[in-house]
Amino acid sequence: MPLGELEDEAMGKILLVGAEGPIRASLNEMMSAEDYKIEYAQSGFEAGIQAESLHPDAVVVDFAMGRNDALLIAANLRKNPEYAETVLIGLLSDEDNAAGFDRTIFNETFRKPFDGALLAERVRTLVGRKKQLV
């Protein structure tokens, strides 16, 4: 196995979808570049392309991109057996929180505003747990 593949397996891979600047900056600052590779997508189409190439351990979907788009991305990931074990985190506004929808599709949801350190810690914990099980 080439060394690059070993590094990829050891490194946590995170895909941020529709995330606003402050959230991106916060996660970049709090997640070690040696331990985590973070990629970004602004749309469902980009998310699909990035997911195919990155095979992320976690996908963080910001509902700021639109509730329907965010739910569609989450549903499509869950339908695909390749991403059955992918950790899925939703970032919700008060409006999204009040609007009823099935949250079981997500491993975790955060309501804005939230502490970026808490999000980073939960991502680390959930990705670490996933990697131990694989």
Positions of PLM-derived features:
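Alpha4 helix (beta4-alpha4-beta5 surface) of REC/receiver domains from two-component response regulators
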Residues: 72, 92-112, 117, 121
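Acidic phosphotransfer microenvironment of two-component signaling modules
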Residues: 21, 42-46, 117
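Non-catalytic signal-transmission and effector/linker regions of two-component phosphorelay proteins
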Residues: 1-20, 115-134
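Acidic, metal-coordinating helix/loop segments flanking the phosphotransfer/catalytic sites
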Residues: 40-58
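Conserved phosphotransfer microenvironments
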Residues: 61-77
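His-Asp phosphorelay/catalytic-motif detector in bacterial-type signaling
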Residues: 55-57, 81-88
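Hydrophobic alpha-helical motif in two-component signaling modules
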Residues: 51, 60, 73-74, 83
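Two-component/phosphorelay signaling modules centered on CheY-like receiver
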Residues: 21-39
